[in-house]
């Protein structure tokens, strides 16, 4: 296990595979504000930037920004890749050259898998990974609308568009974030077999 700032990356070695698990990379915003009841829906980091709107894809300059300033959600930041959390993930991906990425969020029991900027090969792998997740969890597959993904600036968009790395984003939990802790056991039971089967798929087994 290595420690990087306030985050930890766990290196789990089993035969020819290694899984790097990165805990929440935008935790200081919520932790600093949860004591204020009005801010319990805070999604952005402490700078008021939505990390999932901050990745430097080709579409970032044209991405609509309804907030236009630091706030609790959706603000894309003053520049692409401006935030330390974004930079951390970019550096990690560039250094490790992952074969695939499984990205977990909380809210909705759905799986985001497609991207109109992904190559046919990456898109096919995205779909295969999504089918594996759905088989374990029963979550619904969702393809972002064309207008919504045209100028995508999230982690998934960056992986598909700029890096060509197969990936899916899995939204766990019922209701809106923060998902109640009472759901942890059911979420775990639904998802516990996902990672092993994703690894088998990537290895072609």
For every predicted segment, state its role.
Residues 118-137:
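Gly/Ser/Thr-rich active-site loops/lids in small-molecule metabolic enzymes
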Residues 60-61, 142, 204:
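Intrinsically disordered or highly flexible coil/loop and linker segments, enriched in small
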Residues 89, 95, 100-103, 108-123, ...:
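Active-site-adjacent mobile loop/cap segments within catalytic or ligand-binding domains
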Residues 101-104, 138-145:
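Active-site neighborhood of phospho(di)ester-bond hydrolases with catalytic His/Asp-centered motifs
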Residues 1-115, 169-179:
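Active-site/substrate-binding loop(s) of hydrolase catalytic cores
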Residues 46, 136, 162-164:
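Short, well-ordered coil/turn elements that cap or connect secondary structure elements
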Residues 54, 58, 114, 132, ...:
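Surface-exposed loop/turn and secondary-structure junction residues enriched for glycine/proline
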């Amino acid at each position: 296990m290595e420690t990087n700032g306030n985050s930890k990356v766990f290196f789990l070695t089993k035969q020819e595979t290694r899984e790097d698990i990165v805990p929440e990379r935008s935790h200081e915003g919520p932790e600093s504000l949860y004591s204020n009841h009005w801010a319990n829906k805070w999604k952005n980091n402490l700078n008021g930037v939505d990390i999932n709107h901050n990745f430097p894809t080709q579409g970032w300059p044209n991405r609509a920004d309804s907030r236009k300033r630091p706030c609790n959600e959706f603000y894309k930041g003053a520049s692409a890749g401006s935030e330390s959390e974004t930079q951390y993930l970019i550096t990690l991906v560039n250094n490790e050259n992952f074969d695939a990425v499984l990205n977990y969020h909380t809210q909705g029991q759905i799986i985001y898998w497609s991207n109109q900027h992904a190559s046919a090969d990456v898109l096919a792998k995205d779909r295969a990974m999504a089918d594996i997740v759905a088989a374990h969890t029963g979550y619904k597959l969702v393809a972002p609308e064309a207008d919504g993904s045209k100028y995508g600036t999230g982690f998934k968009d960056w992986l598909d568009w700029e890096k060509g790395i197969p990936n899916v984003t899995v939204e766990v939990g019922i209701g809106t974030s923060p998902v109640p802790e009472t759901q942890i056991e059911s979420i775990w039971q639904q998802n516990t077999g996902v990672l092993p089967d994703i690894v088998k798929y990537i290895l072609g087994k």
